Curated annotation (Swiss-Prot):
The gene is ureA. This is Urease subunit gamma. Transmembrane segments: none annotated. The keyword Hydrolase applies. Belongs to the urease gamma subunit family.
C-alpha cells in the first residue's frame, strides 16, 4: 500500500485517538498527544459527517474538559489546527481553547 505523508500522519492520529478514547473510557487522564488526537479526530469526523465549520469547531472544543487530561495539559494546548475535508472542499479548522 502506497500512502502519502499526509495519509500516514492521519493514520497515526486516528490510531492514537483510538487508544486515547479507550483510556478516557477507563477513567485515565490523557496526556498531550492523546488530547490533541481526540480533538483533531473530532474535527475531522465532524467535517466528514457534513457538519458546518462552525459546528465542527464547537463540537471539537467541547469533547474534553480539564478533568479529562493530566495536570498542565490544557495550558499546553491554546489551539488545535487541522485541515479537514468538508462537503464543499478542504478548510483549515482552528479550535481555540479546546480544553475548558
Amino acid at each position: 500500500m502506497q500512502l502519502t505523508p499526509r495519509e500516514v500522519e492521519k493514520l497515526m492520529i486516528y490510531t492514537l485517538s483510538d487508544v486515547a478514547f479507550k483510556r478516557k473510557a477507563r477513567g485515565l487522564k490523557l496526556n498531550y498527544p492523546e488530547a490533541v488526537s481526540i480533538i483533531t479526530v473530532t474535527a475531522l469526523e465532524g467535517a466528514r459527517d457534513g457538519k458546518s465549520l462552525e459546528d465542527v469547531m464547537k463540537e471539537a472544543s467541547k469533547v474534553l474538559t480539564k478533568d479529562d487530561v493530566m495536570e498542565g495539559v490544557a495550558d499546553l494546548i491554546p489551539n488545535v489546527q487541522v485541515e479537514a475535508i468538508f462537503t464543499d472542499g478542504s478548510r483549515l479548522v482552528t479550535v481555540h481553547d479546546p480544553i475548558k
